[in-house]
Structure formats: structure tokens, C-alpha cells
Swiss-Prot record:
InterPro entries: Herpes_UL16/UL94 (IPR004286). It holds the Pfam family Herpes_UL16. This is Cytoplasmic envelopment protein 2. The lineage of its organism: Viruses, Duplodnaviria, Heunggongvirae, Peploviricota, Herviviricetes. GO terms for cellular component: host cell cytoplasm; host cell nucleus; viral tegument. The keyword Iron does not apply. Plays a critical role in cytoplasmic virus egress. Participates in the final step of tegumentation and envelope acquisition within the host cytoplasm by directly interacting with the capsid. Upon virion binding to target cell, a signaling cascade is triggered to disrupt the interaction with the capsid, thereby preparing capsid uncoating. It comes from the Viruses. Interacts with cytoplasmic envelopment protein 3 and with the capsid. It is found in: Virion tegument; Host cytoplasm; Host nucleus. Belongs to the herpesviridae cytoplasmic envelopment protein 2 family. Keywords: Host cytoplasm, Host nucleus, Late protein, Virion, Virion tegument.
Amino acid sequence: MGSRERRWLLKHFLNKECLWVKNSASTAVIKVYTSTTARSPLWPGRHAAMPGIEGPINVTVQLMKPKDRKMCATFYVNGVFVDSCTPTAFYCREVQRYGIYLLFFGDLVDPEPPNVIPENIAVHKNEPPVHLTILQMVNSATLLKTPDDLPKPHVEVVPLGPFGPWMANGSLLQYTINPDLLICCPSIGTLPTMSNIITWITKCENEECESCHGNSDHACVLRGVTLADQNYGSDTCPCVAPCSMRHGNIARITTSSNLLGFLFPPESQNDIVAIRAKSNKLTLNVQDIFCGVTREGEEVACLQSPWLLFGLSHLVSRMVMYGCESIKRKCLRSY
């Protein structure tokens, strides 16, 4: 791969797969930003080896603008030097609500000589992971109530699991318990979406099952770095789904039966032993998506009333996608 193609891929990777956190190593002379993102289906490209370790990609960019010279950007990936170049354009905007920065890089070209490559000075403290709060997700969402609110027929809708959510037009669409009912919902550590709740009550007991409990290869996007010894909430990612549905459409209820009140009428809850996935097509009718199954094999219609269909903002949807390799593979097919 030539340097021009390599830099073209790097530019698009930085612009379309990274959100940034300003690092405490920044000074008046050199600005340091870090980003962490799940492994990419597109970068570093075919037949190119990923620098450093396996797992999430940790990126550091160090920006210097000497007097009377063009900006120089130095990139490290997983601690390995990748490139030192000049962006033909550069844009930076802080998003205080989430403690992140949006960086945009133009074409990457050779820097002016002489070019001194600075060492990687980014510092990272072993701090707890940072997650999107329920309030942040709700405040970023738009309610979809009518057929006119749904994506147009020509728009590709990508289902991420048997019960949603869906990605369309850069927005994550998911059924969520009506916010007015959240006070009644037992804490499951994340926004109580339909897919999360159904997976929660049907997950297997094997905590090493990546399908039910998530894997450790998720990136902590809001921290700007993913450390090797921590699991960053992958058990609440939309990629998680009951392992019992790998080869079928039925998942037996295994735990947390107190959550059934959000799924089925009171008179039928004691009879339901499993959940059947009916269709993962985006719809305003929840009863087209799943139903309950009794011991006798009879189907029980689910409740429609507790559920609202929300579309998350493009930025929050990017945060979710950038944290998960599986979602990237499904939704990020080209630059």
C-alpha cells in the first residue's frame, strides 16, 4: 500500500471512527488528544497489520504549530508510532456535555522539513470507566410515533439483534421503557431497552458466554483510552443477545422474572417460560417483534403500552457504534 492510500485510510479512520478526549499532558506548545475505538473493519486496510496489541484501538494525536510553520500532527496507535504529517485542514470543537472533542482532519501530507517527531507523552490514569448515563441518552433521543417518523423506504435499516435496536441514517433506533415508568424499573445498569431487558431475563449462567454477557473487546469511548484489565460495560451493548437464539428463535426465561411486568399482562406472567423472536424488522407494532411462550407452547402477545421507539442523536449513536466491533462490522462498510 502506497503512502498516499495509507494516509487516505488513516484520515477517514480518524474522522469517521474516532471521538477525542483532551489529555492532561497537553501544554501551550503541544496539544494532546486521545481516542479509543473498537477494532475497525476498514482500517488499517487489507494486508496491513494493526499496530500494537489486539482489541480496542487506542489513538494519540499530538499537535504542534510552530510560529511561521504549518501544523504538524503526530499519530500513535496502541503506543506505536504511525505517522507524522500536516493536515491540509483541521477543525476542533469541544462537546462539554459529554467531555469529548470532535476533531476533523483534511488530507494528510508530508510535513515541512525539518520534522522532529515527538515521543508519545499521553498519560492515562487507572480510573473507573465512563458510561453514557440514562439521562444523557434520553435527552439525546427523538420520539418516533407515526409511520412518517420512520426511515423512508429507500433507507437501509440494519437490525443489530433479534429485538432491535436498528441503525438507520446514522441514528440508533431502539424501543425503551417509557421514561415515566423508569422509577418502577429495577436497575439493570443501563437504559432499559427492549433488547437489554429480554437479554437480561434470558441470559445463560455461564458468565464467560460472550453472546449473553458480552466480551471484553469493547472500547470506553468517553474515557479516550481502553485499558487491558477492564470490561467496559459490554454486557449492556446492543450486540448482546441470548445465546439460545444462535440456532433458533426461542430463549427460555432464566432470571429476573420481576421484569416480566414490562413485557406481558399480569394474568399471563406466571405461565410464560420463554420469549419467541418473531421479526427483527423495524416496526411501530411491538407485538410484531416478539411474544411469550407458555409451557404448553401457546403464544402470548406482549404489551405495547410500556414501550416507546426512540432515535438517538447521531453523536450518541456514534459513541455506541465506536465502542463495539460487532456493530461496526454491520454498519460501517465503507468510507
